[in-house]
Amino acid sequence: MVKDILAPGLRVVFCGINPGLSSANTGFPFAHPANRFWKVIHLAGFTDRQLKPEEAEKLLDFRCGVTKLVDRPTVQATEVKLHGLRSGGRNLIEKIEDYQPAALAVLGKQAFEQGFSQRGIAWGKQKIAIGATMVWVLPNPSGLNRIKTEKLVEAYRELDQALIMRGL
């Protein structure tokens, strides 16, 4: 089981789609060696060094958190069913209402659209908010995603810069 890493007062909560098998086996988020999450958040400015999956709790030191839309692990996120994403979206809203981070970053456009019943969204900051929490959609850092690491870093850095501009 991969547990959430959440606390009040966070700058951002990164929301993955669901745990992969590596994460399910280790209990750490974004644990597959091909997953670029830890590298990308470091290069984008969220952490001062590249953390390892087993150091996930240290995200709190950087006022960052991690959660997921769906608890059930799969080999690929495409195996997650629509009803699981919709239910996960409702649960995620409750978590965000409880913790109220400055931003929620959902990592995947299709997962966001399905989990939040949205259509035709663009990358970046969304029009919707959850209370005072800005909602962003960023590309998923999975190694299965073909987007280049530089583009991932650019997208994540845009969020980091938006938070800095708000004094966070």
UniProtKB/Swiss-Prot annotation:
CC annotations in GO: cytoplasm
UniProt keyword DNA-binding present: yes
Enzyme class: hydrolase
Annotated InterPro entries: MUG/TDG, MUG_bact, Uracil-DNA_glycosylase-like, Uracil-DNA_glycosylase-like_sf
Pfam families, per the entry: UDG
Catalytic activity: Specifically hydrolyzes mismatched double-stranded DNA and polynucleotides, releasing free uracil
Record's subcellular location: Cytoplasm
Positions of disulphide bridges: none
Molecular-function GO terms, alphabetical: DNA binding; pyrimidine-specific mismatch base pair DNA N-glycosylase activity; uracil DNA N-glycosylase activity
Keywords: Cytoplasm, DNA damage, DNA excision, DNA repair, DNA-binding, Hydrolase
Principal location class: cytoplasm
Domain of life: Bacteria
EC numbers, comma separated: 3.2.2.28
UniProt-listed GO biological process terms: base-excision repair, AP site formation
Main function: Excises ethenocytosine and uracil, which can arise by alkylation or deamination of cytosine, respectively, from the corresponding mispairs with guanine in ds-DNA. It is capable of hydrolyzing the carbon-nitrogen bond between the sugar-phosphate backbone of the DNA and the mispaired base. The complementary strand guanine functions in substrate recognition. Required for DNA damage lesion repair in stationary-phase cells.
Assembly behavior: Binds DNA as a monomer.
PANTHER family reported for this sequence: G/T AND G/U MISMATCH-SPECIFIC DNA GLYCOSYLASE, G_T MISMATCH-SPECIFIC THYMINE DNA GLYCOSYLASE
Stated family: Belongs to the uracil-DNA glycosylase (UDG) superfamily. TDG/mug family.
Protein name listed in UniProt: G/U mismatch-specific DNA glycosylase
Name of the gene this protein is made from: mug
